[in-house]
Each structure stands twice: as C-alpha cells, then as structure tokens.
C-alpha cells in the first residue's frame, strides 16, 4: 500500500501521507467547527523553517507542536510521540516522500484536538521527530471542509467554519480574492500566469520555498529562449532522500487580482505534482517564502477560495507584491 507525501525547503523537504485504513470497527469522525466568534485565534509558534506550528492534544495528552501543512493529504505523527503515548501499532504502509518512498508504521489515535475541533479514530503514519523537525504535521484530512487563516502580522492561526456563501463575492479593502477548484482539499487556482505561461497553482504551507515542475520550465524556455537556471540546489526530504533542483527567477506570477514580482523558484520532478495530478502540465507550488509577504492568508475549503490581505504589507524599494491592474 502506498501513500503520497511532499513539501519543500531550502535544506529539507517534508513528506505528507495519504489516507491509511483505521483498525477494524473504527469509523473516522470529526466534531464540526463552531462559528468564528467562538473560535479564537490560536497563537502559533515558528519552527526552524519558519512554518507556523500549533498546539495539538492527542488522546487528551500534550500539547504537541504540529506544523499546519495545506499541501499534505494526511496527518503525520512523530514516532517519539507515538512511543510516549503508547499508541496501538497498525499495518505498515509505504510513505512516498518528495524524493523516495519508505516503509513506515501507522498508529491509531482515538482523539486529536486542535482549538475547538476534535477528530476521532484516526490512523496516521509515523516518522522520526528528527526528520519532521516537529511533533507532527496536520494535513488536509484535518483541515478540509474548514477555513484556515494564517495571520502573519499577529502571528496567529485560526481554523473555523467556511464563510457563508452569500459573502463569497465580498472582499475587504486591500484583499485579493482568488477562486479555486478541486476536491479533497486539493484546491487549485486555474487563472495563474507565470511570465506569460498559463499554469495551475496550489498553496503548500509546509513548503519553505516555492516550486515549479518540468513542464512549466519547458514552457518558459520556449516562450523566452534567454530564460535559464541561476544554479542548482540540493534538497533533502523527510524520508532522507535527496534531489538536486534547478533555481530559476521569474519576472511575474499573475493571478486575477494579484501579481508577484521577481520570484525565485526551485524546479525539479517533485512527486507532489503527481499526487496533485499536475505532473504533465505546467504547475506552480506556492510556498512560505511568498506567503509570508502578506499580512494574512486565508484558505476556505468550503467556498473553494483563497484570500490574500495586503493591509500591513510594506513594500521594499522594488515591490515583491503588487495588486494586478
């Protein structure tokens, strides 16, 4: 059995797992999120790779510090935490990282609580805390169906109910709203254009860097013969696998209401593009190096929309982010 995984950083990449079957007789369930007014923002710590981490309780124990990863299909738990809690060991599964796949154990969790939300009867893969650099990763199995707001200005993170559909077309001043499509949490923005090349984009909050796939690189080279790589970089995923990626600079990444200028991208045959069904066409992974330029980023999995708040953005002499014309 194989489970997909992936995420990016300059010195390491982190893996994500797809669904593992629960023990016989278990049924997965979740306590619905309460309304926004009853869901206060949760103070978020920052790990070595500048990801936001939050406190999670497992079977009533903790708190444990988890990276919130919108590119991960499934939640992953550190082996050391599983040992500490004496969790039941399940079947072994093949966990497919960014670079390679490894055989890893699964454990059964009765309750996992984050803020006002509690998930019950989960089976999750495990990896060493040394590789994760955290106690675990919260994936789309936990986040899908909710609205996740990364408030970089106030250093908080909030998981709440989706916006009401009547408010879907409304946006605050200095807020860019982008519609997305997809299912199972795989929200993709289809109106992305990278230096004149149409591409599909998705947000991965577990990725320290932004990345492009080989089809996007090829399309950029065809459009601009002078386009080329600035160099190479070695990346390591959490399974211990290594890959050498190409580093390239693009002039503009444009969405319907937003433009990024002068963006460095890492380009390689990362497995995450295959997991998201984007291996054969130009695709872009938006990582933390771009997200952190905003005051706030919101991903609404119910309404299938992305919102970027520029209210507190202070541009350098040459802006990295501008509102599109």
Ranges and model annotations:
Residues 4-325:
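Pepsin/retropepsin-fold aspartyl endopeptidases
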